[in-house]
């Protein structure tokens, strides 16, 4: 995920001060590949796999720290919703790992935020999303629309304020090596 040129564009917008002082971060990585309780027990259900926090949460945590720097404090909860699953041999196994993990975080910079990892999110195929709010604007991103970053600026005239789409293209490195025009991916 960190190779996505739109992440670098977001980082540049933040570094340039276009959002003003950053006041909050919200991130989620949610998918639905574990949402059906009839789905069989897999290697992902083994405690050594770490559950949803290790499987999906690691990606949104890496994104958060890439954009805003190190996290210094965490308060969270992890829950197991589907407590038993059948194996491929039709035996029942107890689940001892988390299905959903939610955390409140504070970055070293003082910015606060929330992070969620959820593999029971019915309908979500690749919801690796973040929103960053500042005193002068905001950005938001969804991996399901990986070529797009949305920017809101308080400096826009009131009658045209709103999130505007930035599309990845040749101006967004390293897309310049293979992308001839915006909108191609």
Region locations from a protein language model:
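Predominantly a Rossmann-like dinucleotide-binding segment in NAD(P)-dependent oxidoreductases
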Residues: 2-95, 149
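A short, structured loop/turn motif at beta-sheet edges
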Residues: 19, 106-109
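Glycine-rich phosphate/pyrophosphate-binding beta-alpha loops
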Residues: 58, 117-125, 184
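Short, mixed charged/polar active-site loops
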Residues: 112-114, 138
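Active-site rim elements
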Residues: 49-52, 118, 180-185
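Flexible, active-site-proximal loop/turn residues at the rims of small-molecule/cofactor binding pockets
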Residues: 31, 80, 119-121, 145, ...
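C-terminal glycine/acidic-rich active-site capping loop/insertion
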Residues: 83-94, 102-107, 130-131, 136-185
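Glycine/proline-rich active-site loop of Rossmann-fold NAD(P)-dependent oxidoreductases
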Residues: 95-97, 111, 124-128
């Amino acid at each position: 995920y960190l190779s996505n040129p739109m992440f670098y564009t977001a980082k540049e917008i933040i570094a340039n001060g276009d959002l003003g002082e950053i006041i909050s971060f919200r991130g989620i990585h949610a998918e639905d590949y574990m949402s059906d309780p009839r789905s069989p027990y897999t290697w992902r259900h083994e405690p050594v796999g770490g559950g949803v926090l290790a499987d999906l949460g690691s990606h949104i945590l890496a994104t958060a720290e890439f954009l805003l720097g190190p996290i210094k404090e965490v308060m969270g909860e992890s829950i197991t919703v589907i407590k038993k699953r059948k194996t491929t041999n039709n035996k029942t196994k107890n689940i001892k790992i988390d299905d959903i993990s939610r955390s409140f975080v504070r970055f070293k910079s003082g910015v606060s935020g929330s992070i969620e990892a959820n593999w029971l999110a019915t309908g979500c195929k690749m919801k690796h999303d973040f929103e960053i709010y500042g005193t002068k604007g905001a950005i938001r991103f969804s991996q399901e629309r990986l070529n797009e970053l949305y920017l809101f600026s308080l400096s826009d005239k009131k009658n045209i304020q709103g999130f505007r789409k930035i599309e990845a293209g040749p101006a967004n490195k390293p897309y310049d090596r293979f992308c001839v025009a915006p909108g191609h991916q």
